[in-house]
Amino acid sequence: MSKLITTEPLKSMAEVISNYAMKQQSVSERNIPKKQSLLRKEITYETEVQTSADSIWNVYSSPDIPRLLRDVLLPGVFEKLDVIAGNGGVGTVLDIAFPLGAVPRRYKEKFVKINHEKRLKEVVMIEGGYLDMGCTFYMDRIHIFEKTPNSCVIESSIIYEVKEEYAGKMAKLITTEPLESMAEVISGYVLKKRLQVFGFEIKPKLRFNLLLCLIICLVIAGGMFVAGVPL
């Protein structure tokens, strides 16, 4: 009987079951979508400005920056730049559109960070734009560094994540040029408005008091001159 009873039937069964399981696993693996590889990129532009860090930051962080960009600093650049949520602070959402032919043509962005202590502002694209062209994340970051009391550096950065197959295409499209233009017009705007006395920049809040003091001094000096009092 020992010669007649063998494990061959069990071996055959195990082999059949094993092959079946391997086939099922193969089918299952084919049905699982492959995880797309993402690349994280960062590009930065820096420019030095001969004015105080606070004066530049006051414009970048201003709740009125959307209107200022649309109507004063970059007139005609935007087809639309509307605040659709918020009041200019963190959480504000902008709906932006450019004239026909611009890339990207339209998108929405959100102010996610405004840190006055660090002079740091971050704005994230939340709809449209590069998000429809292969990017899964896109953010503008503005950081103002004080160099001297009367000079600063504007650091403008773009951080984005893109699907690997679109990386080459997006690298050609995404540049710091828009942020460079913004830094240029904001710097020019501030430099035109600044007031210096003996090489020191006078903050806007002090200008009225300074002007008042100068007027008083002139009035006193004029009165002394009329009265014949030696100056």
From Swiss-Prot:
Detected in roots, stems, leaves, flower buds and germinating seeds. One of its GO terms (molecular function) is abscisic acid binding. It comes from the Eukaryota. InterPro entries: Bet_v_I/MLP, Plant_def-hormone_signal, START-like_dom_sf. Dopamine binds at residues 107-109. Activity doubles within 5 hours of elicitor treatment and continues to increase for at least 80 hours. (4-hydroxyphenyl)acetaldehyde binds at residue 140. Its EC number is 3.5.99.14. It is a single-pass membrane protein. The chain crosses the membrane at residues 210-230. It is an enzyme of class 3 (hydrolase). It is found in: Membrane. Keywords: Alkaloid metabolism, Hydrolase, Membrane, Signal, Transmembrane, Transmembrane helix. Pathway: Alkaloid biosynthesis; (S)-reticuline biosynthesis. One of its GO terms (biological process) is alkaloid metabolic process. Belongs to the BetVI family. This is S-norcoclaurine synthase 1. It comes from Papaver somniferum. The gene is NCS1.
